[in-house]
Amino acid sequence: MGYNQQLLRVDYEKIYPINDELSSKILGVIKNLNGKSDILVISDYAKGLITKELMDDIKKEFKGKILIDPKPKNDFYKDVYLIKPNLKEASQILGREIENKDDELEKSGLESVDKYNSNFVITRGEKGATLITVDEIFTMFQQKSKRS
């Protein structure tokens, strides 16, 4: 500590896939959501909870729309309703840098839609977010707050 401020932090963690028992419990909860919820949102932190096998089972069992906030190193989100990466994650998903320009984002977004058979919302920092579907591209701009 220096002048009551943290100067350095070191974390250690072990990341490993979940076991079959926990996977079954998660699927049981998701099955119970059918008829109660039309949308399932999954935020993946790449800590081992969401495995390819679990994701495949979730897609089979859940009858509503699945929305994913992904980690690019996990490449098993095909055929969900919507994937919401930020610009950096979208670049990692495609394996190349995507510039934060409308035409570049539209081209890359359509490529992502085709590759994953899913809609995409790519968040773009101060440039808002862009929704890309098979049929349309829509950019939403962030409203700047006014100070009184």
Curated annotation (Swiss-Prot):
Gene3D superfamilies (UniProt xref): 3.40.1190.20
Protein origin, superkingdom: Archaea
Coiled coil ranges: none
One Pfam family, short name: PfkB
PANTHER family: BIFUNCTIONAL PROTEIN HLDE
Official protein name in the record: Uncharacterized protein MJ1336
Species name: Methanocaldococcus jannaschii (strain ATCC 43067 / DSM 2661 / JAL-1 / JCM 10045 / NBRC 100440)
